From Swiss-Prot:
Database matches in SUPFAM superfamilies: PLP-dependent transferases
Native species: Thermoplasma volcanium (strain ATCC 51530 / DSM 4299 / JCM 9571 / NBRC 15438 / GSS1)
EC number(s) recorded for this UniProt protein: 2.1.2.-
UniProt cross-references to InterPro entries, sorted A to Z: PyrdxlP-dep_Trfase, PyrdxlP-dep_Trfase_major, PyrdxlP-dep_Trfase_small, Ser_HO-MeTrfase, Ser_HO-MeTrfase-like, Ser_HO-MeTrfase_PLP_BS, SHMT-like_dom
GO molecular function, one term: glycine hydroxymethyltransferase activity
Entry cofactors: pyridoxal 5'-phosphate
Main EC class the enzyme belongs to: transferase
Subcellular location: Cytoplasm
Name listed for the protein in its UniProt record: Serine hydroxymethyltransferase
Superkingdom, taxonomy of origin: Archaea
Length: 426
């Protein structure tokens, strides 16, 4: 019976792979790994432990782990042009946990992006910052672009004198105007922390902004969104040695013990691939995002930030109030084979999280599997037919499956593999 239970779980995992293999995946926080990265994820590294820093471990048997971590740090350093790299966090939120423990104490004031303006839940009072016991204050922002207003934010920074200024969003369409706020940072003497989880691959590809050269002391991020690696995290720095030591101590022994060695190795492989393919990949992501946003707008959808070209990242936000609301649209599209998520927009109360006004769309995964501008036009048409024309979801789903059949292989990497193939070992 237990064996049959195990097989039933495997069957569900196979069905999950098939679902995404036949769907257009537009979740802005997901991606698919390269063949080399996937391969190392099922290596013996998955079973092992390594506490501390390379060559100063608390466990034996880490000789090759140390070399892998050294190489990963070397590649990250080259990719992001900094000597301060830490590939140990096991997720973006784990990296954020280390950052807040290193940079602030309970009672300190931290300036953050508003949740209604696309801010991440880890910066909310019910997230990591709240659990750390810090006080928060939100930046004013442009409600149409969901971007911090640098002039008004500078006034607040100078007046309130936060210990830390945190930037970065989960609806991250435009670069943060860090340079415009540098005078306020310098006057107050705060640490500047940039959560680049969503745009890390665009930063690596030199197509978004360079936060470490624009005023950020610390950059945290997950490594599985526009940076197309494993579910893992990273911290980068351009700060003084004492602050960096505090960050590393916060990582271990502060917020983790073992750092998931297989994922760290996959991160290193992805960094190597980004050095070769990342610039083209980032450029194509942004081109596709602009194309899809423009097509949706031309079909009558209320895409935010029209006056700025809709987006400069992988993400766009769409107000679908007139189309039934975010919950209805997301569920209808899922039934039609198009997977994205409902999302709060600036004019929504947080209590509307179960049925907000908007949807969030990201194109990094469909770009990763080879889709281009012509496919963006086709996807926009499918969304229009499902939501506006209310065509039968099963009919749309078959067309989505047919479209996806030509775009299942991972690009911008070494090797060629079906991104959604289920790999059996027995």
């Amino acid at each position: 019976m237990a064996y049959q239970d195990a097989l039933s779980i495997r069957e569900l995992a196979q069905q999950h792979n098939a679902l995404f293999g036949d769907s257009v995946a537009l979740i802005a926080s997901e991606n698919v790994m390269s063949p080399l990265a996937r391969e190392v994820m099922i290596s013996d590294l998955e079973s092992r432990y390594a506490e501390g820093l390379p060559h100063h471990r608390y466990y034996q048997g880490n000789n090759f782990v140390d070399l892998i971590e050294d190489k990963t740090n070397e590649l990250l350093s080259k990719l992001f042009k900094t000597e301060q790299t830490d590939p140990r966090p096991i997720s973006g939120t784990n990296a954020n946990s280390a950052a807040i423990y290193a940079l602030a104490k309970p009672g300190d004031l931290v300036a953050v992006p508003a949740l209604s303006g696309g801010g991440h839940i880890s910066a909310a009072e019910f997230g990591i910052l709240g659990m750390r016991g810090v006080r928060t204050i939100s930046y004013p922002y442009d409600k149409n672009t969901m971007t911090v207003d640098p002039d008004e934010a500078s006034k607040i920074i100078k007046r309130e004198k936060p210990k830390v200024c945190l930037f970065g969003q989960s609806v991250f369409m435009f670069p943060v105007p860090l340079k415009e706020m540098k005078g306020a940072f310098d006057e107050v003497g705060c640490k500047v922390w940039y959560d680049g989880a969503h745009v890390l691959g665009l930063i690596a590809g030199r197509k978004f902004q360079d936060p470490l050269r624009e005023g950020a002391d610390i950059v945290t991020g997950s490594t599985h969104k526009t940076f197309p690696g494993p579910q893992h995290g990273v911290i980068l720095g351009n700060t003084d040695s004492e602050t960096w030591k505090s960050v590393r101590r916060a990582v271990f022994p502060g917020v983790l013990s073992n750092h998931h060695l297989n994922a760290m190795a996959a991160l290193g492989i992805t960094a190597a691939e980004e050095l070769e393919f990342g610039e083209k990949y980032a450029s194509d992501i942004i081109d596709n995002a602009k194309a899809l946003a423009g097509e949706l707008y031309s079909l009558g959808f209320k895409v935010l930030a029209e006056e700025r070209g809709f987006t400069e990242s992988h993400t766009m936000a769409v107000d679908v109030t007139q189309n039934g609301g975010g919950k209805y649209v997301a569920e209808t599209l899922e039934a039609s084979g198009i997977i994205l998520n409902k999302n709060l927009l600036p004019w929504d109360d947080n209590k509307k999280s179960q049925n907000p006004s908007g949807i969030r769309i990201g194109v990094q995964e469909v770009t990763r599997t080879g889709m281009g501008k012509s496919e963006m036009k086709e996807i926009a048409s499918l969304i229009y037919r499902a939501i506006v024309k209310k065509e039968e979801p099963s009919k749309i789903k078959e067309e989505v499956k047919d479209l996806k059949s030509s775009f299942r292989h991972v690009k911008y990497c070494y090797g060629d593999v079906d991104a959604y193939e289920y790999i059996k070992l027995i």
